[in-house]
Amino acid sequence: MSETNERNRRHVYQGRVVSDKMDKTITVVVDTYKNHPVYNKRFRYSKKYYAQDENNEAKVGDTVRIMETRPLSRKKRFRLVKIVKKSV
């Protein structure tokens, strides 16, 4: 399998930065929606991810895109790809 196909299969999520207090690390909340299997009510499900921010450029409130990568630390498995929208 070629290198480009491997890289394209990685998960890419878009979420909101809720913490930037760590050096070169941001905490991103990703909101997704699920349907309840019995009642078919749609509800919001959120999950926090740690992401590598090499230049410390993302701030709290920014909307960012993160991509799955090799394990960078015990909890960090994502890296910052792009800041989609800056906070006010």
Swiss-Prot record:
List the HAMAP family hit by this protein, alphabetically. Answer: Ribosomal_uS17_B
Domain of life where this protein originates = Bacteria
Coiled-coil annotation: which residues? none
Q: What is the lineage of its organism?
A: Bacteria, Bacillati, Bacillota, Bacilli, Lactobacillales
The record lists its disulfide bonds as: none
Species source reads Lactobacillus acidophilus (strain ATCC 700396 / NCK56 / N2 / NCFM)
Q: What does this protein do?
A: One of the primary rRNA binding proteins, it binds specifically to the 5'-end of 16S ribosomal RNA.
State the oligomer form and interacting partners: Part of the 30S ribosomal subunit.
Q: Which InterPro entries match?
A: NA-bd_OB-fold, Ribosomal_uS17, Ribosomal_uS17_bact/chlr, Ribosomal_uS17_CS
**Alphabetical UniProt keywords:** Ribonucleoprotein, Ribosomal protein, RNA-binding, rRNA-binding
GO biological process terms held by the UniProt record: translation
List the molecular function annotations (GO) for this entry.
rRNA binding; structural constituent of ribosome
Q: Which GO terms describe its cellular component?
A: cytosolic small ribosomal subunit
Keyword Ribonucleoprotein annotated:
yes
- Name it: Small ribosomal subunit protein uS17
**Family of this protein:** Belongs to the universal ribosomal protein uS17 family.
